[in-house]
UniProtKB/Swiss-Prot annotation:
It is found in: Cytoplasm. Belongs to the imidazoleglycerol-phosphate dehydratase family. The lineage of its organism: Bacteria, Bacillati, Actinomycetota, Actinomycetes, Mycobacteriales. It comes from Mycolicibacterium vanbaalenii (strain DSM 7251 / JCM 13017 / BCRC 16820 / KCTC 9966 / NRRL B-24157 / PYR-1) (Mycobacterium vanbaalenii). PANTHER family: IMIDAZOLEGLYCEROL-PHOSPHATE DEHYDRATASE, IMIDAZOLEGLYCEROL-PHOSPHATE DEHYDRATASE HIS7. Its main location: cytoplasm. One of its GO terms (biological process) is L-histidine biosynthetic process. This is Imidazoleglycerol-phosphate dehydratase. Keywords: Amino-acid biosynthesis, Cytoplasm, Histidine biosynthesis, Lyase. Coiled coil: none annotated. The gene is hisB. It catalyses: D-erythro-1-(imidazol-4-yl)glycerol 3-phosphate = 3-(imidazol-4-yl)-2-oxopropyl phosphate + H2O.
């Protein structure tokens, strides 16, 4: 829940194109209450993990052309989620700004680092080459792991953050993907939380 002496950090963003219709509601100071429906079951699972482990309250409803392929819906959802994150951050006063996390999942270890800098940048390294061809099947629409990069890149550029995601090692594409999402979640949680020793914008320039 929001601190009574702090402004609410919430956003609702809607985006409609010929390929998708997406609504995202986000509260950065939530408790991990998440409801996601994109029509792509594995992506729903990943976004639920992201919201839960970031301790965001997150509601996502996406309707897209998944009968053709899920890529449009997945990437457009990441765009809107990034926009909501950027809006919810507001003036960024009092936040820690930086965050990072190592996340193990069985044989896999992933790492994510975040700078809420206002300067969007994205680096993605370490995934095995076969991740560009692997498909995680779903009852409604499959998830092609090649989109991992697109999801995080769209999130970073639309939230205007610097985001580095890397897989140090791993074998199972499911574990690699899930560890990356959870690492991003934990890094975001750390970066956007309030620092009790900081009252202004955490930058020597005075703005982010």
């Amino acid at each position: 829940m929001s601190d009574p002496i702090r402004p609410a950090r919430r956003a609702k963003v809607e985006r409609k194109t010929k390929e998708s219709d997406i609504v995202v509601e986000l509260d950065l100071d939530g408790t991990g209450q998440v409801s996601v429906d994109t029509g792509v079951p594995f992506f729903d699972h990943m976004l639920t993990s992201l919201g839960s482990h970031a301790s965001f309250d997150l509601t996502i409803k996406a309707v897209g052309d998944i009968e053709i392929e899920g890529h449009h819906t997945i990437e457009d959802t990441a765009i809107v989620l990034g926009q909501a994150l950027g809006q919810a951050l507001g003036d960024k006063k009092g936040i820690r700004r930086f965050g990072d996390a190592f996340i193990p999942m069985d044989e896999t270890l992933a790492h994510a680092a975040v700078d809420v800098s206002g300067r969007p940048y994205f680096v993605h390294t370490g995934e095995p080459d076969y991740m560009v061809e692997f498909t995680i099947a779903g009852s409604a629409a499959p998830y092609h792991t090649v989109v991992n990069r697109h999801v995080f890149e769209s999130l970073a550029f639309n939230a205007r953050i610097a985001l580095h995601v890397r897989t140090l090692y791993g074998r199972d594409p499911h574990h690699i993907t899930e560890a990356e999402y959870k690492a991003v979640a934990r890094a975001l949680r750390q970066a956007v939380e309030y620092d009790p020793r900081v009252s202004g914008v955490p930058s020597t320039k005075g703005t982010l």
